[in-house]
């Protein structure tokens, strides 16, 4: 006969029940999860079984069941200080943050307690040192340490999101990850090619979605989030469903988002009265003869869009030492207008009547096998198979023209990752593994004519082939790699790590005769190999100082976008360059951290210097066999004379910078946090500016916990200005999007003005089932733009959020 033995799990700080605590019997291999009230019944465990109580936000506890009495309260100590955080992404294995020599950041649901990011791009701004660029409503391109787009690696659940057509300008692919499906997001700063391979120059952003937990007791959990932005007319509806059983578990996430046109701020502290105002617009459904007046110029028309996301995860227990996780994700958006393009002026008129991205679709299915049975060569291992299907397109029609350019890209990406983990008795560990990826790119392009009648425009059946954005006949890109990382505890206070990775990349691109811009290129084969390494050391003093130093190298092998893209912007045409080679980054950094005795307060500073060899950048490029114009630097493209540029290896470059962060917690539940970021960079050979070098920026927040049910936060973020002579010549940073000034001789661009905004957030918990959140952003209605952005940020706006369980 078995008797009930119920206990309650309590937070040791705020004395509230802790739900979702996993209890695992070491000898019985049985497991349970505490309910929403922190209650759990231990009757199924033998009295001599050793129970392990674990939760991602609390320190684990081991205790023999016989020492626990009916009705006991077990107090869990929260993981509240930086040194005790567990990081999953560095070296693709769990590691205590106190032993990591690189700068890392972690974003969890607790960090978002007083806010609801609209997209995963917005989510990344909560980490220190990350700037997000936008050119349209459905955008968000993160920049880390002066690197952006395909120089920052995005990963979701262990699968690379970067693919063969990730470009070097700005990307919006991060918005295809639903922020409400995430359990945690980790950011590794600086070159991280040992663990992740090509593209990880500026750093790695690793999204971890929620995983369902297996439970001996059948259990349902259902949660919802409803959000409405009063001024911007944004609506977000998110639903979670989780089911746990003895042998399997399921997690389902469904989300729909509808974003209205972005309304900019009205207070122009920068002094430019007309900058960014959307005074006129065109009706894209009509053959435009003239501009239409916008009754509210602060409303940036054509920035609205919609998106829905779906995720399904299954967790199957295969044996006592293995499980399988099936992961299905799908994201789909509406058409997304390119706001900066629709406001491009040429000869006094709008250049485009239409310019939009077609629906951006990302589908992923993966199977992850975890094995925890100890063997001679490993204690644990993981095997991950993944397939991704990506679809994107671009559509544009020039002002007063009856033909539309359509460029359509489809990708199929296959990948395999195999990772092994081995702990040794001499306080050392080894992580090693293998990776293979294959990208197949299908690129199409055509011109479609419209018929004009009294009732308006109508699509015709007239289609004409035009040059594709990427190789039209064939586009393949593959990587194969092997890596290892060894870690050793020298003493209780110090440790070091050393790692190495060998990567081989292969690219094949082929154009058909109708799509050749450069007649010297019709078939390109490229093969590159690279060895990258990392070396780190950490020292932790007895008085809570941490000193870390790290050397790491990274590389980026040219992908199909780098070598074979054809793209026109502002009269400049990007053309293919078959001679492009990989670029390399060599990074040295030093970190210093100080923690209080109770670990509640911290201060940290990280400084780094990155040397870039064979830097890939855009430069003027002559197509020697072109005779369409007398000027060797231009060609005729789409009936217009344009300047030709290409990606080239432009010698050596450098980036250096520093970041500072602090956290102060007071006994009466006041919490103050802040971080500052400084970056500089240029070319070693001619000291020309590099793209994506952000001006000095930072943020501060002041939080007060009123009681167990309510708290509020006041936050402040800012950015200094950037002068026009510090913008890159390739145009990646959008100097033309900055204010125009008269310098006494001519009209010139002034560069990006400085700005600062304040936000107020407050939450109230009605019960364990209902919670409200109110966010008043940009309180003083300041007009500003993020650096390199082609769209103004929202002005004062109020967001209302309701979270509920059912």
Predicted regions and their residues:
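Short, acidic, small-residue-rich periplasmic hinge/interaction motif at the N-terminus
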Residues: 22-26, 54-58, 69-113, 149
């Amino acid at each position: 006969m078995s008797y009930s033995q119920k206990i309650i799990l309590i937070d040791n700080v705020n004395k509230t029940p802790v739900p979702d605590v996993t209890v695992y019997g070491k000898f019985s291999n049985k497991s349970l999860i505490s309910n929403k009230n922190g209650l759990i019944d231990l009757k199924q465990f033998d009295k001599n079984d050793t129970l392990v109580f674990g939760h991602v936000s609390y320190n684990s506890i081991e205790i023999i069941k016989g020492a626990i009495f009916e009705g006991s309260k077990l107090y869990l100590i929260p993981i509240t200080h930086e040194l005790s955080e567990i990081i999953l992404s560095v070296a693709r294995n769990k590691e205590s943050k106190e032993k990591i020599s690189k700068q890392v950041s972690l974003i969890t649901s607790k960090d978002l307690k007083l806010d609801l990011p609209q997209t995963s791009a917005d989510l990344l701004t909560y980490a220190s040192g990350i700037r997000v660029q936008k050119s349209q409503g459905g955008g968000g391109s993160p920049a880390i340490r002066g690197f952006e787009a395909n120089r920052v690696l995005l990963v979701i659940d262990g699968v690379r999101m970067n693919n063969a057509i990730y470009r070097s300008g700005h990307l919006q692919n991060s918005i295809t990850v639903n922020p409400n499906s995430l359990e945690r997001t980790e950011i590794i700063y600086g070159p991280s090619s040992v663990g992740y391979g090509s593209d990880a120059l500026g750093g790695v952003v690793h999204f971890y979605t929620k995983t369902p937990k297996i439970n001996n007791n059948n259990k349902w959990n259902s949660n919802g989030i409803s959000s409405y932005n009063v001024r911007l007319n944004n609506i977000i509806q998110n639903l979670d469903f989780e089911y746990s059983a003895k042998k399997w578990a399921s997690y389902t996430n469904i989300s729909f988002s509808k974003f209205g046109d972005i309304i900019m701020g009205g207070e122009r502290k920068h002094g430019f009265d007309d900058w960014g105002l959307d005074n006129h617009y065109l009706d894209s459904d009509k053959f435009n003869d003239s501009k239409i007046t916008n009754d509210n110029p602060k409303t940036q028309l054509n920035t609205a869009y919609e998106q829905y996301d779906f995720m399904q995860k299954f967790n199957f227990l295969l044996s006592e030492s293995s499980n399988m996780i099936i992961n299905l994700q799908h994201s789909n958006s509406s058409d997304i207008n390119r706001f900066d393009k629709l406001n491009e002026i040429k000869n006094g008129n709008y250049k485009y009547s239409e310019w939009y991205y077609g629906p951006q679709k990302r589908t992923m299915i993966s199977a992850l096998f975890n094995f925890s049975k100890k063997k001679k060569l490993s204690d644990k291992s993981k095997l991950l198979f993944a397939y991704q299907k990506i679809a994107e397109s671009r559509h544009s029609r020039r002002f007063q023209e009856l033909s539309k350019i359509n460029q359509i890209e489809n990708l199929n990406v296959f990948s395999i990752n195999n990772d092994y983990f081995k702990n040794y008795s001499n306080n050392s560990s080894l992580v090693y593994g293998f990776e293979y990826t294959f990208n197949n790119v299908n690129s199409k392009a055509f011109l479609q004519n419209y018929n004009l009648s009294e009732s308006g425009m109508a699509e015709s059946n007239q289609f004409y082939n035009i040059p594709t954005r990427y190789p039209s006949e064939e586009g393949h890109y593959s990587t194969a790699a092997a890596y290892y990382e060894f870690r050793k505890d020298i003493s209780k206070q110090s440790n070091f790590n050393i790692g190495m990775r060998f990567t081989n990349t292969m690219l094949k691109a082929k154009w058909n005769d109708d799509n050749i811009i450069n007649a010297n290129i019709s078939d390109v084969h490229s093969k590159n190999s690279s060895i990258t390494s990392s070396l780190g050391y950490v020292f932790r003093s007895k008085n809570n100082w941490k000193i870390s130093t790290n050397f790491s190298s990274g590389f980026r092998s040219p992908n199909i976008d780098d070598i074979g893209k054809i793209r026109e912007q502002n009269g400049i045409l990007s053309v293919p360059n078959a001679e492009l080679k990989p670029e390399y980054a060599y990074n040295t950094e030093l970190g210093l951290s100080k923690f209080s005795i109770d670990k509640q307060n911290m201060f940290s500073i990280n400084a780094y210097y990155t040397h870039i060899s064979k830097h890939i950048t855009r430069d003027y490029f002559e197509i020697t066999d072109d005779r369409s114009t007398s000027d060797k630097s231009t060609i005729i493209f789409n009936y217009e004379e344009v300047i030709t540029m290409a990606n080239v290896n432009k010698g050596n470059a450098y980036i250096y910078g520093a970041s500072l962060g602090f956290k102060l917690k007071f006994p009466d539940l006041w919490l103050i946090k802040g971080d500052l970021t400084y970056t500089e960079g240029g070319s070693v050979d001619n000291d020309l500016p590099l793209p994506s070098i952000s001006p000095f920026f930072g943020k501060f927040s002041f939080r007060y916990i009123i009681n167990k049910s309510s708290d509020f936060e006041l936050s402040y973020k800012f950015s200094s200005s950037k002068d026009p002579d510090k913008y890159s010549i390739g145009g990646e940073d959008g100097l033309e999007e900055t204010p125009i000034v008269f310098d006494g001789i001519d009209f010139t661009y002034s560069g990006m003005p400085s700005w600062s905004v304040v936000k107020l957030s407050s939450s109230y918990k009605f019960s364990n089932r209902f919670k409200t959140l109110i966010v008043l952003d940009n309180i003083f209605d300041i007009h500003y733009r993020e650096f390199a952005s082609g769209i103004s940020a929202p002005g004062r706006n109020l967001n209302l959020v309701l979270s509920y369980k059912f």
